[in-house]
Structures are given as structure tokens and as C-alpha cells.
């Protein structure tokens, strides 16, 4: 009788330690994954997926998962996009050259939050992408600051990270990862219902 009780106690202790170890391992894996991300891709919510994982997550529950593409309208149209993704730009392209940064400057989309709220609730599962993970991280943080709680950063974006191999013909090109390189579906075809025009875009459209 006593030996049985001891065995049960040992089993309970083993199970308890197994659960604790599993929790610590999972937490460690999350921390490790976060630490491997460049600072500019990290978010306050700490929820991360790759493009392939994001597509699988959407595919499992297409009515419950929202995918946001926060690139400019021009990128969305001419570089291609995930067919289920809403285009709600975090910022729009200007025609002002930034000599220090080496590209044309962006200006914030003042309607970003209100436009996201038109398609998603603060408790919805939302996955956000941009070109390669920088703007999407900023978008996730902005949403988190305004009450959204379940927003994932798609870490590799639409185009992915650059090849860093000076001996490669593809050095500097975005072919390492990303939605377009993952085998997930993408298209150039635009569904106007999934495009949220910014104030700047509407002004341009009104002149045409």
C-alpha cells in the first residue's frame, strides 16, 4: 500500500516537473525567436509568424483571421499581394527625396486606425505584413497602443529579406523568404473592395 502511494507520488512529481519543463522550453523558444529578430521587426505584443505560417493560419479560419497589407497602394498593385489581404497603408509615398536615407520619403496615413477598425475588431486575430517586416512592426505597435490585442507580425513580409552573399548573382535581392517566395498564393489582380484609399490617394483620384 505504502509502495503504491510512493509510486503515485513519484508519478505526480514527474508529471509536474514535465509540465514545468515544457513551459520553460516553450517560453525559451519564444524568447529565442524574438531575440533572433532584428530590433526593427520586434513588436510590443510579441506575436510573430512567417508568411507560410500566416497563410496556414488564415486557411484554417478564413472568416476569423484578417490579413492586412500596410504597404503603399503602388506596392500592393505593382509588386503583387496576397489575395485575401486588405490594403491599408501605414504611410504613403511622397515625391520628396530624402538624401540621408536614399529614398523618397513617406508620410503617415492619418486614417490608418479608423480604416483598420472598419474591417476588424480589437479582439480579432489580425496578421500584418509589409515589404519585409519594418513597417508592419510599426503598424502592430500602433494597433496595440489603441486596444488591439491579438495582432501578429508577419516577420518576412511580402518580398522577404535580401540575399547577403557577395558571390551570388542574386546578392541584394529579396529572395531569402517572404510571402512571394514561400509558395503561398499571391496576385496582381486587385479587388477594389479590399483597398482603403488614403486621403492622399483620394486627392489624386479626384484630379483624374
Residues of each region from the PLM?
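Rhodanese-like catalytic fold shared by cysteine-dependent sulfurtransferases
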Residues: 7, 27-52, 57-63, 77-125, ...
